[in-house]
């Protein structure tokens, strides 16, 4: 089994995790990033997705992050998330409803140019990506 290392995961409003893990999988900007003890130092941006922490006993904890940064050192990793939540805390029904509304707003052709919709299009797409990532974190947590 891998050597444990210290991990801190914080968002502007709270600290979500502080403890030892043997592995982290995080959603880096250009793909999933797997971290073990003694990883080479790096800093990367995170995109919306799930952070999976594997503890020494094999238990996996799943968190959702909306984006942020990860700093990796040989014996510790710090994740600074824009927004974050434990997958167990997320309300699946509320997220599904919000996702359906966002998809409808993005896809609904009404035949007229809707300048308000055009201004908010990018924001709606970002929200849709975040909602989809939250649902994926919930599903992973249930496994």
From Swiss-Prot:
Gene (UniProt): atpC
Organism: Dichelobacter nodosus (strain VCS1703A)
Keywords on record: ATP synthesis, Cell inner membrane, Cell membrane, CF(1), Hydrogen ion transport, Ion transport, Membrane, Transport
InterPro entries: ATP_F1_dsu/esu_C_sf (IPR036794), ATP_synth_F1_dsu/esu (IPR001469), ATP_synth_F1_dsu/esu_N (IPR020546), ATPsynth_dsu/esu_N (IPR036771)
Designated name of the protein: ATP synthase epsilon chain
This protein's record includes keyword Metal-binding: no
Assembly and interaction partners: F-type ATPases have 2 components, CF(1) - the catalytic core - and CF(0) - the membrane proton channel. CF(1) has five subunits: alpha(3), beta(3), gamma(1), delta(1), epsilon(1). CF(0) has three main subunits: a, b and c.
PANTHER family assigned: ATP SYNTHASE DELTA/EPSILON CHAIN, ATP SYNTHASE EPSILON CHAIN, CHLOROPLASTIC
Family: Belongs to the ATPase epsilon chain family.
Role, per record: Produces ATP from ADP in the presence of a proton gradient across the membrane.
Example of a GO MF term: proton-transporting ATP synthase activity, rotational mechanism
SUPFAM superfamilies attached to this UniProt entry: Epsilon subunit of F1F0-ATP synthase C-terminal domain, Epsilon subunit of F1F0-ATP synthase N-terminal domain
GO cellular component, one term: proton-transporting ATP synthase complex
Principal cellular location given in the protein's record: membrane
Pfam families attached to this UniProt entry: ATP-synt_DE_N
Membrane topology type: Peripheral membrane protein
Cellular compartment(s): Cell inner membrane
Highest taxon, organism lineage: Bacteria
Transmembrane segment boundaries: none
């Amino acid at each position: 089994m891998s050597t444990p290392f210290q991990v801190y995961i914080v968002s502007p409003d709270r600290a979500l995790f502080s403890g030892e893990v043997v592995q982290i999988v995080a959603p880096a900007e250009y793909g999933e990033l797997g971290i073990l003890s003694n990883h080479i130092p790096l800093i990367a941006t995170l995109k919306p997705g799930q952070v999976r922490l594997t503890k020494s006993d094999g238990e996996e904890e799943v968190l959702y992050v909306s984006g942020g940064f990860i700093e990796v050192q040989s014996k510790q990793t710090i994740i600074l998330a824009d927004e974050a939540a434990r997958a167990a805390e997320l309300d699946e029904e509320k997220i599904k409803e919000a996702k359906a509304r966002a998809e409808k707003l993005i896809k609904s052709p009404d035949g007229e140019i809707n300048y308000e919709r055009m201004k908010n299009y990018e924001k709606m797409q970002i929200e849709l990506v975040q909602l989809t990532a939250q649902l994926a974190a919930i599903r992973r947590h249930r496994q």
